[in-house]
């Protein structure tokens, strides 16, 4: 049986893949970043609790927050905006 001819590798060569590790551009998040997003989520939670407990009392009740009661359903939007902002910041946390 005849032997096959061996090809010459002069036609083209494939360059080897670089195996050097690539450095990550940014390091871990700082402490203030963690405090910021946790704080924003807690502010939103506290806003909801205060609205439910202090602003929904009967009219002229002691301890009623009139300015918060005047906002009405916008209190939910404000509280959830704080919480969602904190949640979005957690996605940037390293």
Swiss-Prot record:
- Coiled-coil intervals: none
Its primary localisation, in coarse terms, equals membrane
Return the GO cellular component terms, semicolon-separated: plasma membrane
Give the GO biological process terms: cell division
Instruction: Report the membrane topology from the UniProt record.
Output: Multi-pass membrane protein
Q: Which InterPro entries match?
A: CrgA
Q: Which UniProt keywords apply?
A: Cell cycle, Cell division, Cell membrane, Membrane, Transmembrane, Transmembrane helix
Tell me the domain of life.
Bacteria
Q: Where in the cell is it found?
A: Cell membrane
Query: Membrane spanning segments where?
Result: 31-51, 71-91
**Is Transmembrane one of the keywords UniProt gives this record?**
yes
What is the purpose of this protein? Involved in cell division.
Similarity section: Belongs to the CrgA family.
Q: What is this protein called?
A: Cell division protein CrgA
Taxonomic lineage is: Bacteria, Bacillati, Actinomycetota, Actinomycetes, Mycobacteriales
Q: Tell me the gene name.
A: crgA
